[in-house]
From Swiss-Prot:
Similarity comment: Belongs to the SecA family.
Organism superkingdom: Bacteria
Residues engaged in binding ATP: Q143, G161, E162, G163, K164, T165, D665
Name of this chain's protein: Protein translocase subunit SecA
Basic and acidic residues bias spans: 1008-1022
Membrane topology summary: Peripheral membrane protein
ATP-binding found in the keyword field: yes
Enzyme class: translocase
Gene that specifies this protein: secA
Binding site for Zn(2+): C1027, C1029, C1038, H1039
PANTHER family named in the record: CHLOROPLAST PROTEIN-TRANSPORTING ATPASE, SECA INNER MEMBRANE COMPONENT OF SEC PROTEIN SECRETION SYSTEM
């Protein structure tokens, strides 16, 4: 029915494109008329458009300036200031709408100017990344359509080789005419710098400035780059700069402007693949013990060995039962299913288990038993697990220690509860009801109980992470070990992620497992998810070759529509049906035979793998056949440029992990078109259809011929976890023999269903993450807005007096109702250094309101005398340092509290409570307490700080700013159990300096990647700090003048 309707009315994408053709015709009309203009006249057209936009919005901008001037009035009440601020926000919304209206009007002329400029540059040489580049690009009509879509704040899906980099220039040029800045977001530093140098000639021709944010730039250079009309950079750099700006101690330290318009290259990679990994700036945890993992490792190793032996025994007995003739017996079927289920939950990657599950009816027996035990919220699943030492839920990436496992790990001379958490509630109740204990004894007992709980919970957590490291994470698959370090391999690209670390102690557990040095732990200082960071932009757009499959997620989370752009030339690549084998061994043999066949024909082949281990296995098999080939994986990434450059040549065989699937452009050598173009041979389906489409997209660029096919086995992770049961039964019915290959529509549909299930599960995780982070996002906005206002304002007296009014009201109410005059005087004196001097009669006669006025007026008089004594400048510094210092300190403590809350919140589900609802309620309570503490301590600092203390505090703030540059760590970390009910893609943390190495990696255009190590920066003065030479001048005016 849907196809019938599409035939009549056309698909959504057809209708989207149809609406844009009239604009393309208008662009081309202007383009033809501009050909006769001189260069100066063409530049003049750009200036005309700028003036036209400025004229359209100038009155609205002037209104904002007028309102902001009113905010500088120190006599305003807080209510009046808030009213003006609300009015400004309304006018800014009006300004944004008017700006978009003006840009839409000039779009055809602006795009025509870019097209004509590109035509004039054809044949001209200029340097790009140290090489000479000859300009040879003029936008096609389909590229103009892509540019219009980007300007409209949508996602433009364009096939490989269709010139996305040039497409981005069109809306970038248009939106840069406003002077408010455009950010172009790439996936690494190399692409940011390359694209900037590549496209700069067009922008500079019209006097627009272009910058690039790179990982190793100092703050003052970043500020210069952000001030440009157009700024290229990575999502991490933009995000971390936002967090750093909200930790700045001086307005001059803020590097970014407002978030106006961003275009994200490879938008699906950034907004979907990276969405589960929050950006986190963290600092070292003082006195953290990193040896705890090594201490407990021997016990875990013994436990894992015992489990392996137990599973081997279970499988031996199950194999005998499978081969006996009484399989029709229901009890026998149940026992076979139970044995297989125990093996699956004890060691799911066991080779014998994977082999047995492929036996006729075995998978059905196991599924029947599992369904039985999963009834009533898995109430009886413990009966399956109690025979094991620990149970593994591979789909959800969780491990649980059983009672049998706890007893096994506890030494004979130790407390039998060595790995059991005490029941704090029950024990506290016992202590409180024990009449033999004094109050002091009770306090001591409770402290001992809390310490015991803390020690044991940490011990159990360490065991859990070590078990995950030994049972769920495989070397040369999820990670590699190089130069004594555990390095994570990106599951989506196959590249090593230097500097990234798994979170929540998992990385330390892997380091203990591999016997390398265990690095220290960190604590969160500032955090935001990429999802919420990119929502800060007034307008957001993106481009990629694969977005259509995730269109619903883009719209639901980001309100971004996906438009598929037609190709300039028709795609002639042949995408063949999947070939399905029963075992990996059969599949690999078939892959080698196909490679041999293609090489004899002279056709180049790119073999895509999902892990380092598989790529090396295939490489060994090819060597045995004496077939020349290149391997490209996380261990050989330095050779990437050379390998990719030769991958399209005659007889070339290239084995590559997913790193060859994105950002690479394989060009065909001479005579390759005649033999069929590049052949793509995928050795396994990825859990995401997008990654498979990326691999297919390496062939068939710009109308080139090519072929793609996937070889799949039932032992592949995707099929084993999500899709093999029905496929096995079909293969059994078809009488499948070893070595047979199946090409069946039902099997292909089963694979697609499996992928959809995983995609839906991952979408649910990302959506859940967003729901949790929205709680933090609202709190973050309140704190950062409050902080930014304090940072930018010269005086904060209005805010201080507003806090004072609240303080006076609350204290008057509290102490008047308690009839505690002395307590009130003592507390006000202690917190504000103000003596309110109340007699008993005055206390009784004034009443609650009168006492509040007395506190307020006495404190205001004190504050004004202090102001007269110290002067406006010093008071402004005291106010600012009070507000910023307290906000920073309390926000860090709040983030630690939130981290603690997340760790245990999922346990509330066992009490039939919704963890998300519980999290929202608990987080709100913590936030209310945070605001109260910030208000009280800010007020106290503002009143009690005097010049000597202020001077010390003044040096403290820039010191913190410097520490931020030297010691703080920028992390990219995935949500733990509080966020997800399924396996995270990669729970990682990224060290800011070490991550420079990752950002500097070229996808396929550098001769040799420079190997980078984590950079430890020596302490350097800030530009506004006193020069260390002792001259008394600021560093930027002394020895830092040329820095």
């Amino acid at each position: 029915m849907l196809k019938f309707i599409e035939k009549i009315f056309g698909s959504k994408h057809d209708r989207d494109i149809k609406r844009l053709w009239p604009i393309v015709d208008e662009i081309n009309e202007h383009f033809e008329s501009y050909k006769s203009l001189s260069d100066e006249a063409l530049r003049g057209k750009t200036q005309e458009l700028k003036e036209q936009i400025k004229e359209h919005i100038s009155d609205i901008e002037q209104s904002i300036i007028t309102e902001k001037k009113q905010l500088e009035n120190l006599e305003l009440t807080i209510e009046e200031a808030e009213s003006i601020q609300e009015k400004i926000e309304g006018i800014e919304k009006e300004l944004h709408d008017a700006t978009e209206e003006a840009l839409n009007e000039v779009l055809p002329e602006a795009f025509a100017i870019v097209k004509e400029t590109a035509r004039r540059l054809v044949g001209k040489e200029y340097p790009v990344m140290g090489s000479t580049n000859i300009w040879n690009m003029v936008p096609y009509d389909v590229q103009l359509i892509g540019g219009i879509v980007l300007h409209q704040g949508k996602i433009s899906e364009m096939a490989t080789g269709e010139g996305k980099t040039l497409v981005a220039v069109l809306p970038t040029f248009l939106n840069a005419l406003t002077g408010k800045g455009v950010h172009i977001v790439t996936v690494n530093d190399y692409l940011a710098q390359r694209d900037k140098e590549w496209m700069t000639p067009i922008f500079e021709f019209h006097g627009l400035t272009v910058g690039a944010i790179l990982g190793n730039m100092p703050p003052y250079q970043r500020k210069e780059q952000y001030a440009c009309d157009i700024t290229y950079g990575t999502n991490n750099e933009f995000g971390f700069d936002y967090l750093r700006d909200n930790m700045a101690g001086d307005p001059e330290d803020v590097v970014q402007r407002e978030f106006n318009y961003a275009i994200i290259d490879e938008v699906d990679s950034v907004l979907i693949d990276e969405a589960r990994t929050p950006l986190i700036i963290s600092g070292p945890v003082p006195n953290a013990d990193v040896n705890k993992y090594n201490e407990i490792k021997p016990r875990v190793e013994r436990l894992v060995r015992a489990q392996q032996n137990l599973v081997a025994k279970i499988l031996t007995e199950t194999e005998k039962a499978i081969k006996t003739p009484n399989k029709a017996d229901k009890d026998a079927e149940f026992n076979i299913g139970l044995g297989l289920l125990r093996a699956k939950r004890g060691q799911p990657k066991n080779n014998k288990f994977i082999k047995l599950i492929g036996e006729p009816n075995a998978a059905r027996f196991m599924q029947t038993v599992e369904n039985e035990f999963l009834k009533d919220n898995a109430r009886r699943m413990h009966e399956v697990d109690e025979e094991l030492y620990f149970s593994i839920d591979e789909k959800n990436h969780t491990i649980e220690l059983t009672e049998k496992g706890r007893e096994f790990m506890t030494d004979t001379h130790e407390d039998p509860d060595f790995f059991v958490l005490p029941d704090v509630g029950t024990e506290i109740s016992k202590i409180d009801s024990d009449a033999t204990l004094s109050e002091q004894d009770k306090v001591q007992k409770k402290d001992e109980l809390y310490r015991l709980f803390s020690v044991r919970s940490e011990r159990i957590h360490n065991v859990s992470q070590l078990l995950r490291a030994f049972s769920l994470y495989t070397r040369d698959d999820e990670y590699v070990v190089q130069d004594g370090k555990v390095l994570i391999v990106d599951e989506f690209t196959g590249r090593i992620l230097p500097g990234r670390r798994y979170s929540d102690g998992l990385h330390q557990a892997l380091e203990a497992k591999e016997g390398v040095k265990i690095e220290g732990e960190t604590q969160t200082m500032a955090t935001i998810t990429l999802q919420n960071f990119f929502r800060l932009y007034k307008k957001l757009a993106g481009m990629t070759g694969t977005a259509e499959t995730e269109a619903s997620e883009f719209f639901e989370i980001y309100k971004l529509d996906v438009v598929v752009i037609p190709t300039n030339k028709p795609i002639v690549r042949k995408d063949q049906e999947d070939l399905i084998f029963k075992t990996k061994r059969e599949k690999y043999n078939a892959v080698i035979n196909k490679i041999q066949e293609l090489q004899e024909k002279g056709q180049p082949v790119l073999v895509g793998t999902t892990s380092v281990d598989v790529s090396e296995t295939l490489s060994r098999m090819l060597k045995m056949k004496h077939i020349e080939h290149n391997v490209l994986n996380a261990k050989q990434h330095a050779r990437e440029a050379d390998v990719v450059a030769n991958a399209g040549h005659k007889r070339a065989v290239t084995i590559a992990t997913n790193m060859a699937g994105r950002g690479t452009d394989i060009k065909l050598g001479e005579g390759i078109t005649e033999v069929g173009g590049l052949f793509i041979l995928g050795t396994e389906r990825h859990e995401s259809r997008r990654i498979d489409r990326q691999l297919r997209g390496r062939a068939g660029r710009q109308g080139d011929p090519g072929t793609s096919v996937f070889y799949v086995s039932l032992e592949d992770d995707l099929m084993r976890l999500f899709g093999s049961d029905r496929v096995i039964s079909v293969m059994d019915k078809l009488g499948h023999q070893e070595g047979d290959v199946i090409e069946h529509s039902m099997v292909t549909k089963s694979i697609e269903r499996a992928q959809r299930r995983v995609e839906e599960q991952n979408f649910a995780i990302r959506k859940r993450l967003l729901e949790y982070d929205n709680v933090m996002n609202q709190q973050r906005e309140v704190i950062y807005t409050r902080r930014r206002k304090a940072l930018e304002k010269r005086r904060l007296r209005i805010e201080i007096f507003d806090l004072l009014r609240d303080y006076a009201d609350k204290h008057a109410e509290k102490f008047y109702q308690a009839l505690d005059k002395d307590g009130l005087e003592e507390q006000v004196l202690r917190e504000l250094s103000v003596d309110i001097k109340l007699t008993v009669d005055a206390f009784e006669k004034l009443g609650e309101d009168g006492i509040a006025d007395k506190i307020y007026n006495t404190a205001v008089d004190f504050y004004k005398r202090k102001e007269e004594l110290l002067g406006n400048d010093i008071m402004a510094q005291i106010e600012k340092y009070s507000v910023l210092g307290v906000i920073d300190q309390k926000w860090r403590e709040h983030l630690r509290d939130i981290d603690d809350l997340k760790e245990g919140i999922n346990l509330r589900a066992y009490g039939q409570k919704d963890p998300l609802l519980e999290y929202k309620q608990e987080a709100f309570k913590l936030f209310v307490d945070l605001l109260e503490e910030i208000s009280t301590e800010t007020l106290s600092f503002a009143f009690k700080l005097f010049p000597q203390q202020a001077a010390e505090r003044a040096t403290f703030i820039p010191e913190r700013s410097r520490v931020r540059q030297e010691r703080l760590v920028a992390q990219h970390e995935v949500a733990q159990s509080a966020y997800a009910t399924a396996a995270p893609a990669a729970e990682t943390t990224t060290t800011a300096k070490a991550a420079d190495a990752a950002r500097q990696q070229p996808p396929a255009a550098e001769n040799e990647e420079q190997k980078r190590q984590p950079v430890h920066v020596e302490k350097t003065p800030g530009r506004n700090d006193p020069c260390p030479c002792g001259s008394g001048k600021k560093y930027k005016h002394c020895h830092g003048r040329n820095a």
